[in-house]
Amino acid sequence: MSFKDLRSFIDHLETNGELKRISHPVDPHLEMTEIADRVLRAKGPALLFENPVGNDMPVLANLFGTPKRVAMALGKEDPIALRDVGELLAFLKEPEPPSGFKDAIAKIPMFKQALNMPPKTVRNPPCQQVVKTGEEVDLTKLPIQHCWPGDVAPLVTWGLTITKGPRQKRQNLGIYRQQLLGKDKLIMRWLDHRGGALDFKDFKEKHPGERYPVVVALGADPVTILGAVTPVPDAMSEYAFAGLLRGERTEVCKALSCDLEVPATSEIILEGYIDPEEMAEEGPYGDHTGYYNETDSFPVFTVTHMTHRKDAIYHSTYTGRPPDEPAMLGVALNEVFVPILRKQYPEIIDFYLPPEGCSYRMAVISIRKQYPGHAKRVMMGAWSFLRQFMYTKFIVVVDEDVNCRDWNDVIWAITTRMDPKRDTVMIENTPIDYLDFASPVAGLGSKMGMDATNKWQGETDREWGTPIVMDEAVKQKVDAIWNDLGIDDAPTL
């Protein structure tokens, strides 16, 4: 099932008991965060605050607060089915020619999907039903959340930032937090390696001193939103990828102030520019680490046009110590990463980003080990293969007999199969998340790999231990007589 806009997804969630309307007045200043946090930790529904204090625009929160809802947004019923999305991405990243007639027939569905890639331009889009320009633009009238007591100002969190570089044909969609600075100004916090920042850098080099056009969409359809946080190939637009997932072309329209295309069914559109000379100090804000981050200087986004649907809905979230909404997104998108990694490294059995690790800072990988040093090769490959793992600080590699998603198994493997000196890899001066205050220098720190696999000849001179396993016939006999033993609640082994 696909959703043309955010509202149709809201209706679907409500029909399936996955959304709760809240009519009681709730303040966007701190109260919404506390309510959403409690509901998310209880694995509760998405929330539609219909009466935010001081505003008549409803606020949608906790939309992707469970992996199930992430899957539902992509037309799947179970997060494990998101591996289909990963298979598609793996194919797009490295398409292989058919090996024969049968293989060509088998690949037809993927080629059919590719026909849905180009976005479709529409006229009179819903996102431009109401148009405000000049003095009419007032961002303070939006119900922007002030998430934590120590936050410096309200923060736009789910803005889909649309940019285009002078060297690319495709547009880039990215999600970057934006601090409210004034009636028509936001601080665009994009890190240097992100698509929007790279587009801006290229533009400044080619057009020094000129204003850079930027558009931010709030409340786009769920597939387009998730396309912006998925490892789409660099040469492909997120609009094209959203069309592939949806099974029909993404509807876009031309922005009023520039040539950028925006999601036509979005709830709110902010259009404007970044002056390369205008910067501002951003933060501090509570973030996904569970701490307040340092302040730093980022470009200022000046909003010249604000358009929106009639009776628009403001889409928002908060970030904090896991679990939070980004952590739940990480759990769901974990299934997308597995086929992509397997395509490059077929020896990988499973891959896990534990949500406690702030979504991406730790990874556990199980492999079918084939030679001495294999675990170290996989570590290096994972760090290098996808941009999403550039900031992963810790990688643990285990054998296929270890469930990499079970901490009991992983800790057992670490403590019995590792020698700290021999099996630990330390790499200095690597890219690290700017928000990681534990690193000695902002944006630059070390990485640690742990080889918790069984060691082969050449990796150790000692006889390696043999795992204890009960005789299968004995286990079956005990199963047969268990009810006669009078022992209750026995685990099934």
UniProtKB/Swiss-Prot annotation:
InterPro entries according to UniProt: UbiD, UbiD-like_C, UbiD-like_N, UbiD_bacteria, UbiD_Rift_dom
CC cofactor: prenylated FMN; Mn(2+)
Domain of life, source organism: Bacteria
Record-given protein name: 3-octaprenyl-4-hydroxybenzoate carboxy-lyase
Residues annotated as binding prenylated FMN: I175, Y176, R177, R189, W190, L191, R194, G195
Family: Belongs to the UbiD family.
UniProt keyword annotations, A-Z: Cell membrane, Decarboxylase, Flavoprotein, FMN, Lyase, Manganese, Membrane, Metal-binding, Ubiquinone biosynthesis
EC number of this enzyme: 4.1.1.98
Pfam families found in the cross-reference section: UbiD, UbiD_C, UbiD_N
Entry GO CC: cytosol; plasma membrane
Topology within the bilayer: Peripheral membrane protein
Gene: ubiD
Species name: Shewanella halifaxensis (strain HAW-EB4)
Catalytic residues (positions): D287 (proton donor)
Pathway in which the depicted protein is active: Cofactor biosynthesis; ubiquinone biosynthesis
Catalysed conversion reaction: a 4-hydroxy-3-(all-trans-polyprenyl)benzoate + H(+) = a 2-(all-trans-polyprenyl)phenol + CO2
